[in-house]
Design a protein with these regions (language model features):
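Short hydrophobic/aromatic-enriched beta-strand-loop microsegments
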Residues: 63-69, 122-127, 162-170
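Short, acidic/turn-prone active-site loops that include or flank metal/cofactor-
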Residues: 70-74, 127-130, 169-174, 191-192
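Predominant activation on well-ordered alpha-helical scaffold segments within soluble catalytic domains
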Residues: 24-27, 53-56, 60, 88-96, ...
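Gly/Ser/Thr-enriched, mixed-charge loops and adjacent short helices
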Residues: 1-98
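Short acidic, glycine/serine/threonine-rich loops at helix termini
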Residues: 53-57, 78-82, 113-118, 154-160, ...
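Active-site flanking residues adjacent to catalytic metal/cofactor-binding acidic residues
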Residues: 44-47, 70, 106-108, 146, ...
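Phosphate-binding and adjacent anionic-ligand microenvironments
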Residues: 101-102, 140-216
Length: 216
């Protein structure tokens, strides 16, 4: 370790503007007014993780009538944190009870998103990236990147749009590096992780939410 003496110690700075910077980039990627005009009824399950606060802000900015569950970012997970069907029964039931148009489930660090349809049915995580790619390709032509464990749905969607998919080894960093090298317009992993370089070279459930609502 390199130790600093008392004169050269670093300083701790608190940045409270992270949500605003992040959400500004997300909102720039979609048509806020078009989404708001539809007045979507949304249930958001943030599993008491990091996505609760910015997730609720995003839905508010997009004019959604949102019901938030497990939205206290204590880190004490309300259910098993993996956003798979067996762990999202509360979300599915809430969508049905409230007559919501869609339900969204974030994982604890908010880089993955699972979707529940208007009937309370769980949509597999593989569909998150596929649906995001479908929307992006309809507006922007360019390559995509996905790891080798991701469904071929993205290949079929890309082919229909006349676009190419670059495959990478498993690992978010490998996908992100390929996207930056190939100037990809969308990318991610089949676990519900979508990467949009307009927001940043990382998986992000917030851009996923915005794109899915724009697609609806």
């Amino acid at each position: 370790f390199n130790y600093a003496d008392s004169v050269n110690c670093g300083k701790v700075a608190i940045n409270t503007g992270g949500d605003a910077v992040h959400l500004k980039r997300v909102l720039a990627c979609v048509n806020k007014n078009q989404i708001a005009a539809k007045k979507f009824r949304v249930v958001l399950d943030s599993v008491n993780g990091a996505g609760a606060r910015p997730g609720k802000k995003l839905l508010s900015y997009l004019g959604c009538r949102a019901t938030a569950i497990n939205d206290m970012p204590t880190g004490l997970f309300a259910h098993k944190p993996e956003p798979i069907a067996e762990n999202l029964t509360q979300l599915c039931d809430m969508v049905k009870r409230t007559g919501a148009d869609v339900g969204f489930a974030q994982d604890p660090d908010a880089d993955r998103l699972a979707i529940v349809d208007e009937k309370g049915g769980y949509i597999g995580e593989e569909y998150t990236l596929a649906l995001a790619a479908k929307y992006v390709f309809s507006h922007t032509k360019g390559p995509a990147a996905a790891n080798l464990s991701t469904s071929r749905m993205i290949d079929d969607i890309a082919a229909a749009a006349g676009c190419e998919v670059f495959r990478t080894p498993v690992g978010e960093v490998n996908v992100a590096q390929a996207m930056m090298q190939k100037n990809c317009v969308i990318g991610g992993e089949g676990n519900g992780g979508v990467i949009d370089l307009r927001v940043g070279p990382v998986r992000d459930s917030l851009i996923s939410i915005a794109i899915i609502l724009q697609l609806c």
